[in-house]
Structures are given as C-alpha cells and as structure tokens.
Amino acid sequence: MDMGRVILGASTVSAVVLAVGLGVAITPGGGLTTDVQGGGICGTFPDDSTPVSTWFMTSFRNDTGHGIRVRDVRPAELHRVTLTHLSIATDPDASSPGLVVTDDADRPAEYGRTVPVDSGYVVPAHGELDVVGRLVLRDDADAGRLHGVVVTTVGPLGTLQSVTDPGSFGIGIGTGHAESDIGCDGA
C-alpha cells in the first residue's frame, strides 16, 4: 500500500512539473513591439491629380535576446485605397521617411532591398522589422487610408503572436479632408 502511494505521489509531482515546464515553454516571452500609440501621417496631391499613390514604412522592434520569425504581415483596415505592394525592408536608410507621396510606382531607394512578407524573415535579436507598402487611391475617392499594420510571428512550439501598429497612412486629393477619411488632422 505504501509503495502505491509513493508511485502515485511521484507521478503527480512529475505531471505538475511537466505541466509547469510546458506552460513556461509556450508562454510568450516578449516579442515585437511598436512605439506608435495611434494617429497618422498623410499627404495630399493638388486638385485633379491622377493617379494618386504613396509609399509608407513602419517599424517594429524585437525586444528579445533571440531572433523572431515573421509568419505574415497584413493591413488591419483599408479605406478607399488599394494596397499594391507590401514587403519587409531588410536594411533601409536611417533617414528613410515614414511616408513618400509620389505617383511613381517604383519603391523609394531609401527603403533599400525588400523581401516578401511570407519569406520567413527572422528579425534579429534587439533588431527592427521595417514594413514598406504602396497605397493607391481608388478612382472614386478623394481621400483614403490604411489603418494599422498587423505582424504575426511564430513563437515557441509553433505558437502564433500578433502585434498591431495602430497608426494610419493616408493619401488624398485637395484639402479639407476629415480625419476619418484620410487618417490625420489638417489635410
């Protein structure tokens, strides 16, 4: 009888230790973060301009001491714009602007080389993830915006973690646009 209790007690202790160990292994230990609290940046073209487009870049920081694999990057919301390009900039210039208002379809040179968002890119320990994209204003709109960029990463044991940059990137024609239309004040 005493031997049975010893075996049962040892089994219980082992199960608890394994459960705690598994919980520690799959609990997120930090990841990507962003300093953006909201708001946005935008630009406008003169009245009667066509086509109207903009390039944008936003950054996420890896606060951990290990690399983090990116699984996916996507817009949270699109309002009257089309996202024609989205990629990861592997080494942008330090002076790269967050928004380049241009009708040029070519990516700005300051953004440097890019890789696809689903390439399995690994954000180095204490490094940055820079996401670049191109927005084109729809023909039937005078202002539009992207609100939020969502990055999904792969954590321990294949767990998925997502972080959202809540900022807006907007583009418009003319002036006097509501913030809800273009994503920033005063445009």
List each language-model region with its residue ranges.
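Non-catalytic macromolecular-recognition regions in eukaryotic signaling proteins
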Residues: 2-187
